[in-house]
Amino acid sequence: DDDTLTFNFAPSGDGNTHYLVCGISLSLNKKSDGYKTYGEDLSAKKNVILADITDIIGDYTMEQYNTDKSAVHDKILKTLQKKFGADYIVDVNIVSSLTQ
């Protein structure tokens, strides 16, 4: 999905609210069993996916995210793979990210 999304970070102790604005897309394996189950269109599962991503990003402060974006990426990917199948969701793409 090419929509721009906003996620809140965990409080960092500076008294300010910090957030991530980005686009998120999923790379899918069209040959997987999951593809046969869910197809190319995960829109019916969008709310579940976004809730998972929101929870994960909310576990990190902005500083933690900026220091180790790959940890956040890996946690999101592993969570979605566990839910939908590792052979189906092969990557999570966080694009045009802006933190504030």
Show which residues each predicted segment covers:
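Flexible, low-complexity charged segments
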Residues: 1-100
